[in-house]
Structure formats: C-alpha cells, structure tokens
Amino acid sequence: MKHLLVCAGLVFAATTVLAQQNAPASPPPNAPASAPKKAPASPPEKATGTIGGHEISISYSSPGVKGREGKIFTKDGLISHNPHYPVWRAGANGATTLETAGDLMIGDVHVPAGKYTLFVDISDPDQWTLIVNKKTGEWGLAYDGSQDLGKTKMQMSKPSSMVENLKWDIKGDGGKGTITLAWEDHEASVPVMAHK
C-alpha cells in the first residue's frame, strides 16, 4: 500500500510540474521578422503542354549556371561527357519525371499513358539521346538501364542566348509537337506525336 501511495504521489507531482512549464513566449510586437527561407539552389519546375488532346508534364529541378559559363558541358565540367558515366538525370535532386495522360510517340519510342523517368545520354556531345525509363521515384544519380522503355536521338542546336537555368519545354500543335531541353549553351529537342 505504501508503494502505491508513493507512486501515486510521484505521478501527481510530475503532472503538476509539467503543467507549470511555460509555453514559449511569442516575440515582442517590435521584434524583427524571422529571416526568410533561402530559395533552393535548384528550384522545382514543371513544364506542361497538350498534344493530341492529352495533357503532358515534365517535373524537374532547375540548376543554374551561376557563373560557370563554359564549364557545364566540358570534359571535366559539371556535366561531363564521360563515356564511363554518360547518363544524366537532366535536372537536379530527384530524377526528371514525364507524365502523360495519353499514348505518345516520343521520337521513335512508343510511350503509353503513364509516368516515367527521363534521362539523357550525353556521351556524344554532338548527339544526345533521350532515355524514357519505367522506374520512377529515383533520387540523385540512380539509373537502372534494364528499366528503359526506349531511347531516341535528340536534335542538337545552340540556343539564341545563354540559358541560365535548366529548362524543359513542351510545345504542342494539335496532334504533334516537341519536347526541348536547354541549359547553358546546349539545346536538344525531340518530336512528339499523339499515338493512335
């Protein structure tokens, strides 16, 4: 009985002490506002378009050149044309994701309605290859080639001016259009058609 009374007393005392703790004080009315949150280095972006009446989107993170002109796509650059590690997530952070509400032909790859991960093979600096991969939810540099739905060559060009932040773009004109990737002094595009 003594132990029961001691335990009950301890529980009561602990409850009383915890109830007396002060809540954090709110800042005084003249206190400066807290510092604004820092913008992410590679902010999330989304390109959208309609081809053949089907909504298409590409979700990606957009890194910036940030004073590294001429140092992005070089032998020892940020995104190197290294034949031993040629596949690029074509963005930053999580892998770039394509979502389509309808069946498409992207270049010569049949892409059924659904969600996919996009990679770009840049081992040949003059001829990039778009890779449509069935495995989604990847982070960073993870790539499983056994999950490729297909690969298609991209048309290379130079943008009219330096592209500071990586950008995907979807342009649709009825049942056809283009998907374009541009960053720094590189631009690569691929034709897209609604698949019947």
Regions found by a protein language model. Give the residues of each.
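Positively charged n-region of N-terminal signal peptides that target proteins for export
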Residues: 1-4, 20
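Residue-level marker of positions within ordered structural domains that often coincide
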Residues: 6, 121, 184
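N-terminal signal peptide c-region/cleavage motif recognized by signal peptidases
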Residues: 14-16
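Primarily secretory-pathway and cell-envelope proteins
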Residues: 21-86, 135-196
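Mid-length scaffold segments of soluble, non-membrane domains
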Residues: 83-138
